[in-house]
Swiss-Prot record:
Sites bearing Pyrrolidone carboxylic acid, chain numbering: Q1
Protein name, UniProt field: Trypsin inhibitor 2
Annotated keywords: Disulfide bond, Protease inhibitor, Pyrrolidone carboxylic acid, Serine protease inhibitor
Posttranslational mods: Contains disulfide bonds.
The UniProt record lists the keyword Cell membrane: no
Lineage top rank: taxon: Eukaryota
Thermal behavior of activity: Thermostable. 10% inactivation is seen after incubation at 95 degrees Celsius for 2 hours at pH 9.0. Retains activity after incubation at 120 degrees Celsius for 1 hour at pH 3.0 and pH 7.0, but at pH 9.0 40% of the activity is lost.
Organism for this UniProt entry: Opuntia streptacantha (Prickly pear cactus)
Activity at various pH: Optimum pH is 8.0. Alkaline pH values decrease the thermostability of this inhibitor.
Length: 38
C-alpha cells in the first residue's frame, strides 16, 4: 500500500491516499479532481 506524503498529490478515487493522518485537500468533491496532501 503506497501513500502520498505532505505536498504530494492525492486522489482517493484512484486509491492514492495520504500517509497517516495527513488530509487530502481537494478543490472540489465533484467531479472528482486530484488533491494535495496537507
Amino acid at each position: 500500500q503506497q501513500c502520498a506524503e505532505r505536498g504530494q498529490s492525492c486522489n482517493p478515487y484512484e486509491g492514492i491516499e495520504c500517509c497517516g493522518d495527513i488530509l487530502c485537500i481537494q478543490p472540489r468533491i465533484w467531479p472528482p479532481v486530484p488533491g494535495r496532501c496537507a
